Structure formats: structure tokens, C-alpha cells
């Protein structure tokens, strides 16, 4: 596996992440919610993190991106930065 692309939404609490995930499951757009609610600068780009290889992100993030189903929202995933909802957009 050489690279993946993903979007994410970063918030401070598990509860916030779970509430946002429910909104997405209810039909709200991932990109729009990332722009509105994410604490990461990538939120301005709809949570887009671009392309990255294994080892470029924190371990917990990599484990999801390089092992879980593409085009599905995963999480909340806890890292040192907070709680993430992760949408894997592609993986080679």
C-alpha cells in the first residue's frame, strides 16, 4: 500500500464527533460539516488532507485509513489531537 487520500473532521470530544456522525448518517454533507465544525485547518477545504503514505499521520489515524473501507465514515477515532471522523476517499 503506497498512498491514500482522506478527509476528516477534528473535534475536542467524543460526544461532538458522535453527534456529527449522526448528522452525516442523516444525510448532511461531510465537507460542509468539516468546513463548519472541524478544529483542523483542513476544515476550510472540507477536511481534505490530500495524499499521504503510511507513517505520515499518527498511528491511530493510519490504522483506519490503511485498513478500513473506502468511502465510508469511520470513527470517532481518538488521537493526541482530539477525536476524528475519517472518510477515506481513495487508497492505492
Regions found by a protein language model. Give the residues of each.
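Proteostasis/folding factors centered on peptidyl-prolyl cis-trans isomerases
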Residues: 1-10, 37, 60-92
